[in-house]
Amino acid sequence: MALRACGLIIFRRHLIPKVDNTTIEFLLLQASDGIHHWTPPKGHVDPGENDLETALRETQEETGIEASQLIVLEGFRRELNYVARKKPKTVIYWLAEVKDYDVEIRLSQEHQAYRWLGLDEACQLAQFEEMKATLQEGHQFLCSTPA
């Protein structure tokens, strides 16, 4: 059975002008261990939790951002399937916008750095093709949805 994890692709954007979606920035976290890869906040599902509850809890634990500081967008949910540490893994992601552009990020010990990045930079740091594709799909979704 595949390991299951859930997370949020967190973004922020300047809303002036509203038609300009080139100002979208994604939040990526750099892991403290392993290959120090960059991903959105995510983590394993705890017993009794649903997937979205897991994503919100992990986001709070890893970034300090509370659910009340986010708007989870309807209509975007992506499932990534890959092998991690020789085991199959499934990760579910939703898109979530921070309500405050200057929200404070407080990293847990699991991560050593964070960056707000435009799509191209985010895709360069996201080493895995599935993650790059998901970021691109998220950006495309945002550009086709009014702010």
Swiss-Prot record:
Query: EC top class, in one word?
Result: hydrolase
Q: Which residues carry this modification: N-acetylalanine?
A: 2
Q: Where is this motif: Nudix box?
A: 43-64
Instruction: Name the keywords, alphabetized.
Output: Acetylation, GTP-binding, Hydrolase, Nucleotide-binding
The UniProt record lists the EC number as: 3.6.1.17
**What InterPro entries does the record tag this protein with?**
Nudix_hydrolase, NUDIX_hydrolase-like_dom_sf, NUDIX_hydrolase_CS, NUDIX_hydrolase_dom, Nudix_hydrolase_domain, Tetra_PHTase
A GO biological process held by the record: ATP biosynthetic process
Cofactor binding, per record: Divalent metal ions.
Q: Where is the Nudix hydrolase domain positioned along the sequence?
A: 2-139
Q: So which domain of life are we looking at?
A: Eukaryota
- List the cofactors: a divalent metal cation
Q: Which GO terms describe its molecular function?
A: bis(5'-nucleosyl)-tetraphosphatase (asymmetrical) activity; GTP binding; hydrolase activity
The reaction(s) annotated as catalysed by this protein in its Swiss-Prot or TrEMBL entry are: P(1),P(4)-bis(5'-guanosyl) tetraphosphate + H2O = GMP + GTP + 2 H(+); a 5'-end CoA-ribonucleoside in mRNA + H2O = a 5'-end phospho-adenosine-phospho-ribonucleoside in mRNA + (R)-4'-phosphopantetheine + 2 H(+); a 5'-end FAD-phospho-ribonucleoside in mRNA + H2O = a 5'-end phospho-adenosine-phospho-ribonucleoside in mRNA + FMN + 2 H(+)
Q: Which is a Pfam family this sequence falls into?
A: NUDIX
Function as written in the Swiss-Prot or TrEMBL entry: Catalyzes the asymmetric hydrolysis of diadenosine 5',5'''-P1,P4-tetraphosphate (Ap4A) to yield AMP and ATP. Exhibits decapping activity towards FAD-capped RNAs and dpCoA-capped RNAs in vitro.
Which family, according to the similarity comment? Belongs to the Nudix hydrolase family.
Please report the name of this protein according to its UniProt entry. Answer: Bis(5'-nucleosyl)-tetraphosphatase [asymmetrical]
Q: Which organism is it from?
A: Rattus norvegicus
Q: What is the lineage of its organism?
A: Eukaryota, Metazoa, Chordata, Craniata, Vertebrata
